Amino acid sequence: MFPVKGLSVSADKLKVEPGAIVGTAPAAPAPASAPAVSSSKPSKKRKRHGGDKDVNVDASNLVDLWEKVIEQKKEGVADGVKKHENKRLKKEHEGQGEKLSNSNNDGNQGERKNNKKKNKNKNKNQGEHGIQVAQKKGPKKVEGEEDEDDNNDDADEWEGIDEDEKHASSEKPTPKKDDKKQQQLQQQQQQKKQQKNQEKDNRNGTTSNWQQDKPQPKTATPAPKLTPLQASMREKLISARFRHLNETLYTRPSTEAFKLFEESPEMFTEYHEGFRRQVDVWPENPVDVYIKEIKERAKVRFAPKISGGAEGGKSLPPARFPLPRDQKTKVCTIADLGCGDAKLAKTLVPLKQKLRLEIHSFDLQTGGCELVTRADIANLPLPDNSVDLAIFCLALMGTNWLDFVEEAYRILRWRGELWVAEIKSRFAGSQARVKQPPQKKVVAHSVGKRKKGSALAVAEEEEGDPEQNNLDLAVHVDGDTSKLKKPHETDITAFVEALKRRGFLLNRDFGDNSVDMGNKMFVRMHFVKAAVPTRGKCVPKDGQEDTTKNKKGGQKPKPKFIEEKDEQEEVKDEAAVLKPCVYKIR
Protein backbone atom coordinates (compact mmCIF):
# COMPACT_ATOMS: atom_id res chain seq x y z
CA MET A 1 0.00 0.00 0.00
CA PHE A 2 1.19 3.49 -0.78
CA PRO A 3 2.07 5.29 2.47
CA VAL A 4 0.29 8.53 3.20
CA LYS A 5 1.72 11.17 5.52
CA GLY A 6 -0.13 11.77 8.80
CA LEU A 7 -1.92 8.41 8.93
CA SER A 8 -1.06 5.44 11.19
CA VAL A 9 -3.69 2.66 11.00
CA SER A 10 -3.16 -0.83 12.35
CA ALA A 11 -3.32 -3.74 9.95
CA ASP A 12 -6.20 -5.38 11.83
CA LYS A 13 -8.58 -2.61 11.01
CA LEU A 14 -7.85 -2.71 7.30
CA LYS A 15 -10.62 -4.09 5.05
CA VAL A 16 -10.77 -4.98 1.40
CA GLU A 17 -12.95 -2.68 -0.68
CA PRO A 18 -15.57 -4.31 -2.81
CA GLY A 19 -14.75 -4.17 -6.54
CA ALA A 20 -11.04 -3.40 -5.94
CA ILE A 21 -8.51 -4.43 -8.56
CA VAL A 22 -6.70 -7.65 -7.82
CA GLY A 23 -3.08 -7.12 -6.94
CA THR A 24 -3.51 -3.64 -5.56
CA ALA A 25 -3.40 -2.75 -1.91
CA PRO A 26 -6.60 -1.49 -0.29
CA ALA A 27 -6.74 2.22 0.39
CA ALA A 28 -6.74 3.51 3.94
CA PRO A 29 -10.17 4.36 5.33
CA ALA A 30 -10.98 8.00 5.74
CA PRO A 31 -11.65 9.37 9.22
CA ALA A 32 -15.18 9.60 10.49
CA SER A 33 -15.32 13.35 10.37
CA ALA A 34 -14.41 13.48 6.67
CA PRO A 35 -17.14 12.85 4.10
CA ALA A 36 -17.14 9.56 2.20
CA VAL A 37 -15.36 9.64 -1.13
CA SER A 38 -16.13 7.13 -3.85
CA SER A 39 -13.19 5.32 -5.39
CA SER A 40 -14.53 5.56 -8.90
CA LYS A 41 -14.75 9.36 -9.11
CA PRO A 42 -12.09 11.63 -7.64
CA SER A 43 -12.93 14.91 -5.96
CA LYS A 44 -13.72 17.82 -8.22
CA LYS A 45 -12.15 20.36 -5.88
CA ARG A 46 -8.72 21.78 -6.64
CA LYS A 47 -7.01 21.42 -3.32
CA ARG A 48 -3.61 22.58 -2.22
CA HIS A 49 -0.64 20.33 -1.72
CA GLY A 50 -1.49 19.82 1.95
CA GLY A 51 -5.00 18.38 1.40
CA ASP A 52 -4.20 15.11 -0.41
CA LYS A 53 -5.22 12.83 2.48
CA ASP A 54 -8.80 12.45 1.19
CA VAL A 55 -7.67 11.13 -2.21
CA ASN A 56 -7.25 7.38 -2.72
CA VAL A 57 -3.96 6.43 -4.33
CA ASP A 58 -4.20 3.84 -7.11
CA ALA A 59 -2.06 2.77 -10.01
CA SER A 60 -4.28 4.86 -12.23
CA ASN A 61 -3.81 8.16 -10.37
CA LEU A 62 -0.29 7.64 -9.05
CA VAL A 63 1.38 9.53 -11.91
CA ASP A 64 -1.09 12.41 -11.68
CA LEU A 65 -0.61 12.75 -7.93
CA TRP A 66 3.19 12.66 -8.32
CA GLU A 67 3.10 15.45 -10.91
CA LYS A 68 0.64 17.45 -8.85
CA VAL A 69 2.21 17.16 -5.39
CA ILE A 70 5.91 16.58 -5.98
CA GLU A 71 6.55 18.28 -9.34
CA GLN A 72 3.97 21.01 -8.67
CA LYS A 73 2.27 20.61 -12.05
CA LYS A 74 -1.32 21.74 -12.43
CA GLU A 75 -3.94 19.11 -12.95
CA GLY A 76 -5.67 19.02 -16.32
CA VAL A 77 -9.42 19.35 -16.48
CA ALA A 78 -11.21 16.00 -16.80
CA ASP A 79 -13.26 15.17 -19.86
CA GLY A 80 -16.91 16.03 -19.45
CA VAL A 81 -16.25 18.55 -16.65
CA LYS A 82 -16.46 22.25 -17.29
CA LYS A 83 -17.05 21.83 -21.03
CA HIS A 84 -17.72 25.51 -21.52
CA GLU A 85 -14.45 26.61 -19.90
CA ASN A 86 -12.43 23.82 -21.50
CA LYS A 87 -13.61 24.80 -24.99
CA ARG A 88 -12.67 28.43 -24.38
CA LEU A 89 -9.20 27.53 -23.15
CA LYS A 90 -8.58 25.22 -26.11
CA LYS A 91 -9.68 27.85 -28.60
CA GLU A 92 -7.40 30.49 -27.08
CA HIS A 93 -4.32 28.26 -26.83
CA GLU A 94 -4.69 26.40 -30.14
CA GLY A 95 -5.24 29.63 -32.11
CA GLN A 96 -8.71 28.76 -33.34
CA GLY A 97 -10.60 31.95 -34.13
CA GLU A 98 -14.06 30.55 -33.43
CA LYS A 99 -16.43 32.67 -31.44
CA LEU A 100 -18.83 31.39 -28.84
CA SER A 101 -22.49 32.11 -28.84
CA ASN A 102 -23.75 35.39 -27.47
CA SER A 103 -25.65 33.62 -24.70
CA ASN A 104 -22.53 32.05 -23.22
CA ASN A 105 -20.52 35.28 -23.57
CA ASP A 106 -23.16 37.38 -21.79
CA GLY A 107 -23.16 35.01 -18.86
CA ASN A 108 -19.40 34.98 -18.44
CA GLN A 109 -18.65 38.71 -18.88
CA GLY A 110 -20.04 39.54 -15.47
CA GLU A 111 -17.96 36.83 -13.85
CA ARG A 112 -14.79 38.12 -15.53
CA LYS A 113 -15.25 41.66 -14.25
CA ASN A 114 -16.00 40.52 -10.71
CA ASN A 115 -13.15 38.01 -10.62
CA LYS A 116 -10.47 40.34 -12.01
CA LYS A 117 -10.35 42.39 -8.82
CA LYS A 118 -10.37 39.28 -6.62
CA ASN A 119 -7.63 37.54 -8.57
CA LYS A 120 -5.13 40.41 -8.23
CA ASN A 121 -4.49 39.59 -4.59
CA LYS A 122 -4.84 35.83 -5.22
CA ASN A 123 -2.26 35.86 -8.01
CA LYS A 124 0.22 37.62 -5.79
CA ASN A 125 -0.30 35.11 -2.99
CA GLN A 126 -0.19 32.15 -5.36
CA GLY A 127 2.98 33.44 -7.04
CA GLU A 128 4.70 33.88 -3.70
CA HIS A 129 3.43 30.49 -2.52
CA GLY A 130 4.65 28.80 -5.74
CA ILE A 131 8.15 30.25 -5.27
CA GLN A 132 8.28 28.98 -1.69
CA VAL A 133 7.19 25.50 -2.79
CA ALA A 134 9.88 25.33 -5.49
CA GLN A 135 12.53 26.28 -2.97
CA LYS A 136 11.45 23.94 -0.16
CA LYS A 137 10.39 21.01 -2.45
CA GLY A 138 7.26 19.90 -0.63
CA PRO A 139 6.60 21.78 2.63
CA LYS A 140 4.98 20.07 5.55
CA LYS A 141 1.26 20.25 6.21
CA VAL A 142 0.06 22.99 8.49
CA GLU A 143 -3.05 22.76 10.61
CA GLY A 144 -6.04 24.76 9.57
CA GLU A 145 -5.48 24.35 5.83
CA GLU A 146 -8.63 22.32 5.41
CA ASP A 147 -10.77 25.32 6.22
CA GLU A 148 -8.96 27.37 3.60
CA ASP A 149 -9.52 24.62 1.01
CA ASP A 150 -13.23 24.64 1.69
CA ASN A 151 -13.41 28.38 1.16
CA ASN A 152 -11.64 28.08 -2.23
CA ASP A 153 -14.14 25.70 -3.84
CA ASP A 154 -14.59 27.91 -6.86
CA ALA A 155 -10.90 28.14 -7.61
CA ASP A 156 -11.15 25.69 -10.52
CA GLU A 157 -13.50 27.92 -12.43
CA TRP A 158 -11.95 29.98 -15.26
CA GLU A 159 -11.68 33.54 -14.00
CA GLY A 160 -10.78 35.36 -17.21
CA ILE A 161 -6.99 35.14 -16.67
CA ASP A 162 -4.90 32.69 -18.63
CA GLU A 163 -2.16 30.62 -17.02
CA ASP A 164 0.53 32.37 -19.08
CA GLU A 165 -0.83 35.72 -17.96
CA LYS A 166 -0.68 34.59 -14.33
CA HIS A 167 2.99 33.68 -14.66
CA ALA A 168 3.75 36.96 -16.44
CA SER A 169 1.95 38.96 -13.74
CA SER A 170 3.77 37.12 -10.97
CA GLU A 171 7.17 37.78 -12.61
CA LYS A 172 6.73 41.58 -12.73
CA PRO A 173 8.98 43.05 -10.03
CA THR A 174 7.33 46.42 -9.44
CA PRO A 175 4.54 48.41 -11.08
CA LYS A 176 5.24 51.35 -13.39
CA LYS A 177 4.12 53.94 -10.86
CA ASP A 178 6.93 53.03 -8.49
CA ASP A 179 9.49 53.36 -11.32
CA LYS A 180 8.25 56.83 -12.19
CA LYS A 181 8.46 57.92 -8.57
CA GLN A 182 12.02 56.63 -8.28
CA GLN A 183 13.07 58.46 -11.45
CA GLN A 184 11.56 61.70 -10.20
CA LEU A 185 13.39 61.34 -6.88
CA GLN A 186 16.70 60.74 -8.66
CA GLN A 187 16.21 63.79 -10.88
CA GLN A 188 15.44 65.97 -7.88
CA GLN A 189 18.57 64.77 -6.10
CA GLN A 190 20.74 65.52 -9.15
CA GLN A 191 19.28 69.02 -9.44
CA LYS A 192 20.01 69.69 -5.78
CA LYS A 193 23.63 68.57 -6.24
CA GLN A 194 24.09 70.85 -9.26
CA GLN A 195 22.66 73.81 -7.36
CA LYS A 196 25.05 73.19 -4.47
CA ASN A 197 28.04 72.98 -6.83
CA GLN A 198 27.02 76.22 -8.53
CA GLU A 199 26.75 78.00 -5.19
CA LYS A 200 30.23 76.79 -4.22
CA ASP A 201 31.68 77.93 -7.54
CA ASN A 202 30.09 81.35 -7.20
CA ARG A 203 31.53 81.75 -3.72
CA ASN A 204 35.03 80.74 -4.83
CA GLY A 205 34.82 82.82 -8.01
CA THR A 206 35.37 79.84 -10.30
CA THR A 207 33.29 78.18 -12.99
CA SER A 208 32.43 74.52 -13.31
CA ASN A 209 33.74 72.25 -16.03
CA TRP A 210 30.58 72.25 -18.09
CA GLN A 211 30.66 76.05 -18.18
CA GLN A 212 34.31 76.11 -19.25
CA ASP A 213 33.70 73.66 -22.09
CA LYS A 214 31.12 75.94 -23.71
CA PRO A 215 32.54 77.57 -26.88
CA GLN A 216 32.97 81.29 -26.52
CA PRO A 217 31.34 83.47 -29.17
CA LYS A 218 33.61 85.01 -31.78
CA THR A 219 34.26 88.74 -31.59
CA ALA A 220 34.10 89.50 -35.31
CA THR A 221 30.96 87.56 -36.20
CA PRO A 222 28.54 89.31 -38.56
CA ALA A 223 25.12 90.45 -37.47
CA PRO A 224 22.69 87.52 -37.38
CA LYS A 225 19.83 89.34 -39.09
CA LEU A 226 20.85 91.53 -42.01
CA THR A 227 18.95 92.41 -45.10
CA PRO A 228 20.73 92.01 -48.45
CA LEU A 229 21.21 95.78 -48.60
CA GLN A 230 22.71 95.88 -45.10
CA ALA A 231 25.03 92.98 -45.90
CA SER A 232 26.34 94.67 -49.04
CA MET A 233 26.85 97.95 -47.17
CA ARG A 234 28.76 96.10 -44.45
CA GLU A 235 31.08 94.54 -47.04
CA LYS A 236 31.76 97.97 -48.51
CA LEU A 237 32.55 99.40 -45.07
CA ILE A 238 34.98 96.57 -44.30
CA SER A 239 36.80 97.04 -47.61
CA ALA A 240 36.89 100.83 -47.14
CA ARG A 241 38.28 100.39 -43.63
CA PHE A 242 40.97 98.07 -44.97
CA ARG A 243 42.00 100.51 -47.72
CA HIS A 244 42.30 103.33 -45.19
CA LEU A 245 44.46 101.29 -42.80
CA ASN A 246 46.55 99.88 -45.64
CA GLU A 247 47.36 103.32 -46.98
CA THR A 248 48.21 104.49 -43.45
CA LEU A 249 50.72 101.66 -42.97
CA TYR A 250 52.40 102.24 -46.34
CA THR A 251 52.81 106.01 -45.93
CA ARG A 252 54.19 106.04 -42.37
CA PRO A 253 57.33 104.64 -40.75
CA SER A 254 57.07 101.48 -38.69
CA THR A 255 57.50 103.30 -35.36
CA GLU A 256 54.27 105.26 -35.88
CA ALA A 257 52.40 102.14 -37.00
CA PHE A 258 53.66 100.31 -33.90
CA LYS A 259 52.25 103.02 -31.63
CA LEU A 260 48.99 103.13 -33.59
CA PHE A 261 48.27 99.44 -33.04
CA GLU A 262 49.43 99.69 -29.45
CA GLU A 263 46.79 102.31 -28.70
CA SER A 264 43.98 100.50 -30.58
CA PRO A 265 44.61 96.75 -30.98
CA GLU A 266 41.19 96.20 -32.57
CA MET A 267 42.46 97.93 -35.71
CA PHE A 268 44.83 95.01 -36.28
CA THR A 269 41.95 92.51 -36.48
CA GLU A 270 39.95 94.86 -38.73
CA TYR A 271 42.91 95.23 -41.07
CA HIS A 272 43.51 91.49 -41.44
CA GLU A 273 39.82 90.77 -41.89
CA GLY A 274 39.84 93.01 -44.95
CA PHE A 275 43.16 91.55 -46.08
CA ARG A 276 41.70 88.02 -46.09
CA ARG A 277 38.85 89.18 -48.29
CA GLN A 278 41.33 90.63 -50.76
CA VAL A 279 43.53 87.51 -50.82
CA ASP A 280 40.51 85.29 -51.49
CA VAL A 281 40.16 86.96 -54.89
CA TRP A 282 43.77 86.14 -55.82
CA PRO A 283 44.47 82.96 -57.77
CA GLU A 284 47.16 81.96 -55.27
CA ASN A 285 48.27 82.94 -51.78
CA PRO A 286 52.07 83.31 -51.43
CA VAL A 287 51.94 82.00 -47.86
CA ASP A 288 50.60 78.68 -49.11
CA VAL A 289 53.43 78.51 -51.66
CA TYR A 290 56.05 79.08 -48.95
CA ILE A 291 54.48 76.45 -46.67
CA LYS A 292 54.61 73.89 -49.46
CA GLU A 293 58.23 74.75 -50.30
CA ILE A 294 59.35 74.46 -46.68
CA LYS A 295 57.75 71.03 -46.34
CA GLU A 296 59.40 69.79 -49.53
CA ARG A 297 62.86 71.17 -48.83
CA ALA A 298 62.85 70.02 -45.19
CA LYS A 299 62.81 66.41 -46.40
CA VAL A 300 65.88 66.88 -48.65
CA ARG A 301 69.19 66.05 -46.96
CA PHE A 302 71.80 66.69 -49.65
CA ALA A 303 72.05 69.21 -52.47
CA PRO A 304 72.12 67.92 -56.06
CA LYS A 305 75.49 67.60 -57.78
CA ILE A 306 74.64 69.91 -60.68
CA SER A 307 74.27 73.49 -59.53
CA GLY A 308 71.91 75.63 -61.54
CA GLY A 309 72.87 78.99 -62.95
CA ALA A 310 76.31 79.27 -61.36
CA GLU A 311 78.28 78.31 -64.48
CA GLY A 312 75.55 78.29 -67.05
CA GLY A 313 74.32 74.88 -65.97
CA LYS A 314 70.79 73.61 -65.89
CA SER A 315 68.58 75.51 -63.45
CA LEU A 316 66.82 73.31 -60.89
CA PRO A 317 63.69 74.08 -58.87
CA PRO A 318 64.15 75.13 -55.23
CA ALA A 319 62.43 71.95 -54.01
CA ARG A 320 65.57 69.96 -55.01
CA PHE A 321 67.75 71.79 -52.47
CA PRO A 322 67.75 71.36 -48.68
CA LEU A 323 66.90 74.12 -46.26
CA PRO A 324 69.75 76.07 -44.63
CA ARG A 325 70.40 74.68 -41.15
CA ASP A 326 72.65 75.22 -38.19
CA GLN A 327 75.75 73.04 -38.54
CA LYS A 328 75.67 71.99 -34.87
CA THR A 329 72.00 71.40 -34.12
CA LYS A 330 70.85 70.61 -37.69
CA VAL A 331 67.74 72.71 -37.03
CA CYS A 332 66.39 75.31 -39.44
CA THR A 333 65.35 78.49 -37.62
CA ILE A 334 62.69 80.47 -39.51
CA ALA A 335 61.70 84.09 -38.82
CA ASP A 336 58.33 85.11 -40.29
CA LEU A 337 58.56 88.91 -40.38
CA GLY A 338 55.14 90.54 -40.66
CA CYS A 339 53.29 87.25 -40.12
CA GLY A 340 49.74 88.64 -39.81
CA ASP A 341 47.50 85.85 -38.50
CA ALA A 342 50.52 83.46 -38.31
CA LYS A 343 49.21 80.97 -40.84
CA LEU A 344 52.72 79.71 -41.56
CA ALA A 345 53.46 79.05 -37.88
CA LYS A 346 50.07 77.42 -37.22
CA THR A 347 50.66 75.00 -40.07
CA LEU A 348 54.30 74.11 -39.38
CA VAL A 349 54.46 74.10 -35.57
CA PRO A 350 52.79 70.65 -35.32
CA LEU A 351 55.48 69.34 -37.73
CA LYS A 352 58.50 71.09 -36.24
CA GLN A 353 59.89 67.99 -34.52
CA LYS A 354 59.49 65.83 -37.59
CA LEU A 355 60.97 68.43 -39.96
CA ARG A 356 63.44 69.81 -37.36
CA LEU A 357 62.19 73.40 -37.52
CA GLU A 358 62.04 76.33 -35.14
CA ILE A 359 59.69 79.17 -36.03
CA HIS A 360 59.55 82.78 -34.77
CA SER A 361 56.66 85.02 -35.85
CA PHE A 362 56.71 88.82 -35.46
CA ASP A 363 54.18 91.54 -36.21
CA LEU A 364 52.95 94.90 -34.91
CA GLN A 365 50.23 93.17 -32.83
CA THR A 366 49.64 89.61 -31.66
CA GLY A 367 45.95 89.45 -32.57
CA GLY A 368 45.31 87.05 -29.66
CA CYS A 369 47.67 84.38 -31.03
CA GLU A 370 50.26 82.85 -28.70
CA LEU A 371 52.64 82.09 -31.56
CA VAL A 372 53.08 85.78 -32.49
CA THR A 373 55.55 88.14 -30.81
CA ARG A 374 54.70 91.83 -30.83
CA ALA A 375 57.66 93.83 -32.16
CA ASP A 376 58.78 96.47 -34.63
CA ILE A 377 60.35 94.73 -37.63
CA ALA A 378 63.16 97.33 -37.67
CA ASN A 379 64.15 96.27 -34.11
CA LEU A 380 63.69 92.53 -33.62
CA PRO A 381 64.32 90.85 -30.24
CA LEU A 382 66.73 88.29 -31.74
CA PRO A 383 70.52 87.98 -31.43
CA ASP A 384 72.90 88.37 -34.36
CA ASN A 385 73.46 85.41 -36.68
CA SER A 386 70.69 83.29 -35.12
CA VAL A 387 68.28 82.67 -38.02
CA ASP A 388 68.61 80.48 -41.12
CA LEU A 389 65.60 81.71 -43.10
CA ALA A 390 63.83 85.09 -43.05
CA ILE A 391 60.54 85.64 -44.87
CA PHE A 392 58.90 88.90 -45.99
CA CYS A 393 55.53 87.85 -47.36
CA LEU A 394 53.82 91.10 -48.45
CA ALA A 395 55.36 92.70 -45.36
CA LEU A 396 57.74 95.39 -46.70
CA MET A 397 55.36 98.14 -45.58
CA GLY A 398 56.26 101.57 -44.34
CA THR A 399 58.59 104.25 -45.59
CA ASN A 400 61.55 102.63 -43.80
CA TRP A 401 61.30 99.21 -45.47
CA LEU A 402 65.07 99.27 -46.10
CA ASP A 403 65.55 99.11 -42.32
CA PHE A 404 63.65 95.82 -42.38
CA VAL A 405 66.11 94.42 -44.92
CA GLU A 406 69.09 95.56 -42.85
CA GLU A 407 67.60 93.96 -39.73
CA ALA A 408 67.13 90.71 -41.63
CA TYR A 409 70.82 90.82 -42.61
CA ARG A 410 71.75 91.22 -38.93
CA ILE A 411 69.81 88.19 -37.65
CA LEU A 412 70.65 85.84 -40.56
CA ARG A 413 73.62 83.49 -40.54
CA TRP A 414 76.10 83.46 -43.40
CA ARG A 415 74.54 81.82 -46.45
CA GLY A 416 71.14 82.22 -44.85
CA GLU A 417 68.21 82.76 -47.19
CA LEU A 418 65.83 85.70 -47.55
CA TRP A 419 62.47 85.10 -49.23
CA VAL A 420 60.54 88.13 -50.50
CA ALA A 421 57.03 88.15 -51.97
CA GLU A 422 55.68 91.52 -53.09
CA ILE A 423 52.92 92.97 -55.24
CA LYS A 424 53.95 93.59 -58.86
CA SER A 425 52.40 97.04 -58.98
CA ARG A 426 54.75 98.31 -56.26
CA PHE A 427 57.96 97.97 -58.29
CA ALA A 428 58.88 101.31 -59.87
CA GLY A 429 61.55 99.87 -62.19
CA SER A 430 65.06 101.04 -62.98
CA GLN A 431 63.96 104.62 -63.67
CA ALA A 432 63.39 105.19 -59.94
CA ARG A 433 67.04 104.52 -59.10
CA VAL A 434 68.76 107.51 -60.78
CA LYS A 435 67.32 110.87 -61.69
CA GLN A 436 68.02 111.30 -65.36
CA PRO A 437 68.21 114.78 -66.90
CA PRO A 438 65.40 115.72 -69.26
CA GLN A 439 66.22 114.69 -72.81
CA LYS A 440 66.07 117.21 -75.62
CA LYS A 441 63.49 116.00 -78.06
CA VAL A 442 62.98 117.38 -81.54
CA VAL A 443 59.70 119.15 -81.96
CA ALA A 444 57.34 117.42 -84.35
CA HIS A 445 56.81 120.57 -86.46
CA SER A 446 60.50 121.51 -86.80
CA VAL A 447 61.93 122.24 -90.25
CA GLY A 448 64.95 119.98 -89.77
CA LYS A 449 62.81 116.93 -88.99
CA ARG A 450 60.75 117.43 -92.12
CA LYS A 451 63.80 117.13 -94.35
CA LYS A 452 63.76 113.97 -96.39
CA GLY A 453 66.78 111.69 -96.13
CA SER A 454 68.83 113.92 -93.86
CA ALA A 455 72.33 112.65 -93.17
CA LEU A 456 71.81 112.76 -89.39
CA ALA A 457 68.70 110.55 -89.48
CA VAL A 458 70.32 108.03 -91.76
CA ALA A 459 73.39 107.83 -89.51
CA GLU A 460 71.29 107.28 -86.40
CA GLU A 461 69.30 104.51 -88.03
CA GLU A 462 72.46 102.78 -89.20
CA GLU A 463 74.19 102.94 -85.83
CA GLY A 464 71.24 102.36 -83.51
CA ASP A 465 71.66 101.04 -79.94
CA PRO A 466 74.61 98.59 -79.71
CA GLU A 467 73.03 96.63 -76.83
CA GLN A 468 69.78 96.24 -78.71
CA ASN A 469 71.68 95.13 -81.79
CA ASN A 470 73.46 92.43 -79.80
CA LEU A 471 70.13 91.17 -78.42
CA ASP A 472 68.66 91.04 -81.91
CA LEU A 473 71.65 89.05 -83.15
CA ALA A 474 71.33 86.63 -80.24
CA VAL A 475 67.69 86.07 -81.09
CA HIS A 476 68.27 85.52 -84.83
CA VAL A 477 71.46 83.46 -84.57
CA ASP A 478 71.28 81.60 -81.25
CA GLY A 479 67.54 81.76 -80.61
CA ASP A 480 68.11 83.10 -77.06
CA THR A 481 65.00 85.04 -76.01
CA SER A 482 65.56 84.93 -72.25
CA LYS A 483 67.09 88.43 -72.12
CA LEU A 484 64.35 90.10 -74.07
CA LYS A 485 61.93 92.00 -71.88
CA LYS A 486 58.28 91.42 -72.36
CA PRO A 487 56.13 94.53 -72.74
CA HIS A 488 54.17 93.82 -69.51
CA GLU A 489 57.00 92.25 -67.49
CA THR A 490 57.73 93.71 -64.04
CA ASP A 491 61.10 95.41 -63.74
CA ILE A 492 62.76 94.40 -60.46
CA THR A 493 66.34 95.42 -61.28
CA ALA A 494 66.30 98.46 -59.00
CA PHE A 495 65.00 96.38 -56.10
CA VAL A 496 67.64 93.69 -56.65
CA GLU A 497 70.41 96.31 -56.72
CA ALA A 498 69.14 97.91 -53.51
CA LEU A 499 69.33 94.57 -51.72
CA LYS A 500 72.73 93.88 -53.26
CA ARG A 501 74.15 96.98 -51.56
CA ARG A 502 72.92 95.51 -48.26
CA GLY A 503 74.59 92.13 -48.73
CA PHE A 504 71.85 90.06 -50.42
CA LEU A 505 72.30 88.34 -53.77
CA LEU A 506 69.90 86.29 -55.83
CA ASN A 507 70.38 82.59 -55.19
CA ARG A 508 72.60 81.38 -58.06
CA ASP A 509 71.89 77.74 -57.22
CA PHE A 510 68.30 78.16 -58.40
CA GLY A 511 69.29 79.91 -61.61
CA ASP A 512 66.27 81.44 -63.32
CA ASN A 513 64.01 79.94 -60.63
CA SER A 514 65.35 82.41 -58.06
CA VAL A 515 62.73 84.86 -59.38
CA ASP A 516 59.19 83.62 -59.96
CA MET A 517 56.82 85.87 -61.89
CA GLY A 518 54.33 83.19 -62.78
CA ASN A 519 51.61 84.73 -60.66
CA LYS A 520 49.88 87.77 -62.11
CA MET A 521 49.53 89.46 -58.70
CA PHE A 522 52.92 89.15 -56.96
CA VAL A 523 56.61 88.31 -57.46
CA ARG A 524 58.60 85.79 -55.40
CA MET A 525 62.39 86.15 -55.02
CA HIS A 526 65.06 84.04 -53.28
CA PHE A 527 68.08 85.94 -51.90
CA VAL A 528 71.15 84.71 -50.03
CA LYS A 529 73.30 86.49 -47.45
CA ALA A 530 76.51 86.14 -49.45
CA ALA A 531 78.08 89.62 -49.73
CA VAL A 532 79.44 92.39 -47.55
CA PRO A 533 77.00 95.31 -47.38
CA THR A 534 78.08 98.72 -48.59
CA ARG A 535 75.04 100.60 -47.31
CA GLY A 536 73.06 100.58 -44.11
CA LYS A 537 73.77 99.82 -40.49
CA CYS A 538 75.44 96.47 -41.18
CA VAL A 539 78.41 97.95 -43.03
CA PRO A 540 81.61 96.83 -41.24
CA LYS A 541 83.51 99.62 -39.54
CA ASP A 542 86.91 98.37 -40.69
CA GLY A 543 85.75 98.39 -44.28
CA GLN A 544 84.75 102.05 -44.08
CA GLU A 545 88.24 103.06 -42.91
CA ASP A 546 89.98 101.06 -45.63
CA THR A 547 87.92 102.53 -48.41
CA THR A 548 88.97 106.06 -47.49
CA LYS A 549 92.73 105.28 -47.55
CA ASN A 550 95.10 104.45 -50.36
CA LYS A 551 97.92 101.90 -50.33
CA LYS A 552 100.42 104.34 -48.78
CA GLY A 553 98.09 105.19 -45.90
CA GLY A 554 97.11 108.62 -47.11
CA GLN A 555 93.66 109.85 -47.98
CA LYS A 556 92.31 109.00 -51.41
CA PRO A 557 91.68 112.02 -53.59
CA LYS A 558 88.05 112.69 -54.26
CA PRO A 559 87.01 112.28 -57.89
CA LYS A 560 86.36 115.45 -59.76
CA PHE A 561 83.09 116.67 -61.16
CA ILE A 562 81.00 114.64 -58.63
CA GLU A 563 78.87 116.45 -56.11
CA GLU A 564 78.83 115.37 -52.46
CA LYS A 565 75.04 115.24 -52.35
CA ASP A 566 74.73 112.57 -55.02
CA GLU A 567 74.94 109.74 -52.47
CA GLN A 568 72.15 111.19 -50.30
CA GLU A 569 69.92 111.69 -53.31
CA GLU A 570 70.52 108.11 -54.42
CA VAL A 571 69.56 106.80 -50.95
CA LYS A 572 66.30 108.72 -51.15
CA ASP A 573 65.64 107.23 -54.54
CA GLU A 574 66.27 103.71 -53.15
CA ALA A 575 63.38 104.13 -50.73
CA ALA A 576 61.19 104.96 -53.74
CA VAL A 577 62.00 101.66 -55.44
CA LEU A 578 58.88 100.20 -53.83
CA LYS A 579 55.88 102.44 -54.34
CA PRO A 580 53.31 102.71 -51.53
CA CYS A 581 49.76 101.53 -52.08
CA VAL A 582 47.77 104.74 -52.41
CA TYR A 583 44.10 104.58 -53.34
CA LYS A 584 42.11 107.11 -55.32
CA ILE A 585 39.72 109.30 -53.37
CA ARG A 586 36.25 108.92 -54.84
Swiss-Prot record:
Enzyme Commission code: 2.1.1.-
Localization annotation: Nucleus, Nucleolus
GO cellular component entries: nucleolus
One example of a Gene Ontology biological process annotation: ribosomal large subunit biogenesis
Enzyme class: transferase
Task performed by this protein: S-adenosyl-L-methionine-dependent methyltransferase that specifically methylates the N(1) position of a conserved adenine in helix 25.1 in 25S rRNA. Required both for ribosomal 40S and 60S subunits biogenesis. Required for efficient pre-rRNA cleavage at site A2.
Annotated Basic residues bias: 114-123, 550-559
Biased composition annotated in UniProt, kind: Basic and acidic residues: 65-83, 164-182, 539-549
GO molecular function: rRNA (adenine) methyltransferase activity
Keyword rRNA-binding: no
PANTHER family: RIBOSOMAL RNA-PROCESSING PROTEIN 8
Metal-binding is among the record's keywords: no
Cysteine pairings via disulfide bonds: none
Biased composition (Acidic residues): 144-163
Protein name, per record: 25S rRNA (adenine-N(1))-methyltransferase
Composition bias, Low complexity: 25-41, 183-192, 217-229
Record-stated family: Belongs to the methyltransferase superfamily. RRP8 family.
Signal peptide (from-to): none
